[in-house]
Design a protein with these regions (language model features):
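Phosphate-binding/catalytic loop of phosphoryl-transfer enzymes
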Residues: 1-83, 90, 97
């Protein structure tokens, strides 16, 4: 469970100070792209699963736009999950090698 992980088990995406009673985002690539929220409630935490992987990939840099162009030749829809899963990480690597 996330609440028993130590600092050495976590990776910070952005520095800052956390609010002890604020919801936490949980994301992770694997066979798909998992996304959930961990929400504090009284003396416990409630897990709220999500479908964040289904969001469309929205490039913001030239490199990301080139990646989208390449992957659009292979996939009809390029979602976050298309990129951030096992197969997608290989696709990103191969695109960067071109």
């Amino acid at each position: 469970m996330l609440t028993v992980l130590g600092d050495e088990d976590l990776i910070s995406l952005k520095s800052g100070s956390a609010c002890i009673d604020a919801p936490l985002a949980i994301i992770g690539p694997g066979t798909g792209f998992g996304a959930a929220a961990l929400v504090p409630s009284q003396n416990t935490w409630i897990t709220m699963p999500g479908e964040g992987g289904h969001a469309a990939f929205a490039p913001t840099t030239e490199l990301e736009r080139e990646l989208l162009t390449l992957l659009s030749q292979k996939y009809q829809h390029v979602s976050v999950e298309t990129l951030l899963c096992g197969r997608g990480l290989v696709d990103i690597y191969q695109a960067l090698c071109q």
